[in-house]
Amino acid sequence: VIGSDPKLILDVACGPGAVTKALAKKTTARIVGLDLSEEMLRQGQANVTSSGLSERVSLVLGRGEQLPFADATFDGLTFTYLLRYVEDPKATLAELARVVKPGGPIASLEFAVPASLGWRFAWWCYTRTVLPIAGYLTGGRGWWHVGRFLGPSISNHYKRYPVHWIINAWEHAGIDHVEYQSMSLGGGVVTWGYRTR
């Protein structure tokens, strides 16, 4: 996304603004962060303000499934941890592609399930035991529940929508040259492509 010298980037499911801030620091573009959680947007605004990026970053309330923007508004788009939380990933991808100019880059970051049996077992143990306990120790009972939810949520998503299905869904949504790269020993995946011209 940053290699195309964009002027305006949309960051969907921006949460507290980590990716939004990174985009603002690595480009001269204006960045719009969108999230459905008012609390996440409050945290994001505090992060943006404390980083001195308020002049180029704006945060708006909205859903990835129904974006409040006209067709072909943005030069590029990113989204993070979104498709596990929507009812219709194909329709959501089409909606994301709709607001990107033809040829514009689209990229996502998502958790994944490692392909290797050994790493998958280690990942399963980590997400079912270590993550909930660490959540509880650092953030209390609420984060314990988040930790317990995350592993099964990721597993169920990839059982329902394996990687080849997701790549096909990107292409079906009007995104060309789709590629993906596993990271963190298979516990994460970056996917990217370009809006059909």
Protein language model features and the residues they cover:
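Class I SAM-dependent methyltransferase SAM/SAH-binding core
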Residues: L8-Q66
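C-terminal alpha-helical "lid/dimerization" subdomain adjacent to the S-adenosyl-L-methionine
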Residues: L36, V113-A169, E179
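A short acidic, Gly/Pro-enriched loop at the edge of an enzyme's catalytic core
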Residues: E65-G76
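A short SAM/SAH-binding and catalytic strip from SAM-dependent methyltransferases
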Residues: D75-P89
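Short "lid" loop at the C-terminus of a central beta-strand within the Rossmann-like core
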Residues: L83, F111-A115, L185
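A short glycine-rich, Lys/Arg-flanked "PGG" loop and its adjoining helix->strand segment in the class I
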Residues: K90-P102
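Conserved beta-strand signature within the Rossmann-like core of class I S-adenosyl-L-methionine
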Residues: G104-F111
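Core SAM-dependent methyltransferase catalytic element
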Residues: A173-R197
